[in-house]
């Protein structure tokens, strides 16, 4: 995960954005008014993210069990008598965090580098947090090894399922491979298993899902 966290640098960045806007730069942003709003990822990154926020001095008690709330309040505990509500946590999908920050829905956010690169937005990358580490992989069914190459020779393109169309397209283009990208949002592994695509491009932390579905 990357793309935060230092309270001082966040506040400085937000102030700089407001100064730029006052000088005639009308880029989308929230400015320095109201509570600092942080886009927090749900899912596998959540637990480590809460630990990072807490270590940084933020009260995340409401965030640990938000129920159905999408926005919860917090405070900077280092301020001693901080007022509950001086920080807002917006709970989002990791892949959506860059858009929330880039389009003014949050002042800062936490997500994986994969989401940041795929979003391709002009964002200030504050820090790498050192958790949620994954590897990009290209995989196909083991039982159909070599079929992708034969399909490529026959139709002149490789059909690839991925939730990272921008990254995958660039990767194949750099290698001179003509790829037809099939954009999926979940269960990417199904693409080649059911014969819809030749391969997948995805991220993996342990490789367990690949092994369980006989992908190599």
What are these regions (language model features)?
Residues 26-216:
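Domain-level signature for soluble enzymes in the chorismate/prephenate branch of the shikimate pathway
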Residues 1-27, 32:
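TRNA-recognition modules of translation machinery and tRNA-sensing kinases, especially anticodon-binding
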């Amino acid at each position: 995960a990357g793309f935060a966290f230092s309270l001082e640098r966040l506040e400085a960045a937000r102030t700089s954005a407001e100064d730029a806007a006052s000088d005639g730069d009308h880029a989308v942003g929230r400015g320095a008014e109201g509570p600092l709003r942080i886009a927090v990822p749900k899912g596998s990154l959540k637990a480590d993210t809460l630990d990072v926020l807490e270590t940084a001095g933020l009260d995340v008690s409401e965030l640990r069990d938000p129920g159905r709330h999408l926005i919860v309040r917090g405070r900077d505990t280092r301020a001693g008598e901080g007022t509950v509500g001086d920080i807002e946590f917006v709970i989002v999908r990791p892949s959506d965090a860059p858009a929330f920050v880039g389009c003014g829905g949050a002042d800062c956010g936490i997500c994986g580098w994969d989401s940041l690169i795929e979003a391709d937005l002009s964002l200030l990358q504050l820090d790498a947090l050192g958790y949620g580490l994954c590897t990009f992989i290209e995989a196909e069914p083991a039982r159909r090894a070599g079929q992708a190459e034969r399909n490529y020779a026959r139709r002149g393109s490789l059909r690839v399922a991925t939730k990272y169309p921008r990254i995958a397209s660039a990767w194949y283009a750099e290698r001179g491979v003509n790829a037809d990208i099939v954009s999926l949002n979940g269960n990417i592994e199904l693409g080649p298993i059911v014969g819809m695509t030749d391969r997948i491009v995805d991220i993996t932390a342990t490789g367990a899902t690949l092994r369980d579905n006989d992908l190599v």
